[in-house]
Amino acid sequence: MMELQGKFLIAMPHLDDYFNRTVVFMCEHNEQGSMGLVINQPTDLSIAELYSKLNFMMKNDRTFGNEMVVAGGPVHTERGFILHKNTLNAFQHTYKVTEELSMTTSADVVETLGSTFAPEKYLVALGCSSWGAGQLEKEISDNAWLVVSSKDQILFDMPYEDRYVAANQLLGIHPYNFALAQVGHS
């Protein structure tokens, strides 16, 4: 079984549905299936707005950057998934993804955002991407996805619109290579 947990999946150009030009960070991959978060499709909801909506009765004294909530995938689109650097805080529903990263689905992590108790780096997603047993492996063998080791800089620090090109460049691929490869296909 190929090891995909903690890796990036890069959508090949012929994927023209929800996953067109996406980069997915793989949070879980085992014999039951796979789950990941699209990291380069921001919604129109900022993390500051999300915090305010969830805590509308509380005084908002938090400091937020201008990070947006991303659309993590077409499954469970009303559910929040927070991918973050590991912390000393013990959140209720946290799953260790790699030695450095965890995913939390409980609201207690949201309560720390914008404060000194927040994880050092985090990505907030609504929805996730999931595959049944063997489904993702088949899609990879059908050349729907490229697989590459993830980089925290792309995951947390890079502008959303640059993440697809940057992930491809980890493999030495530049966008114009795809344009040339598409000539003659109808």
From Swiss-Prot:
It comes from the Bacteria. Belongs to the UPF0301 (AlgH) family. One of its GO terms (cellular component) is cytosol. SUPFAM superfamilies: VC0467-like. This is UPF0301 protein CGSHiEE_01530. InterPro entries: AlgH-like. Gene3D superfamilies: VC0467-like.
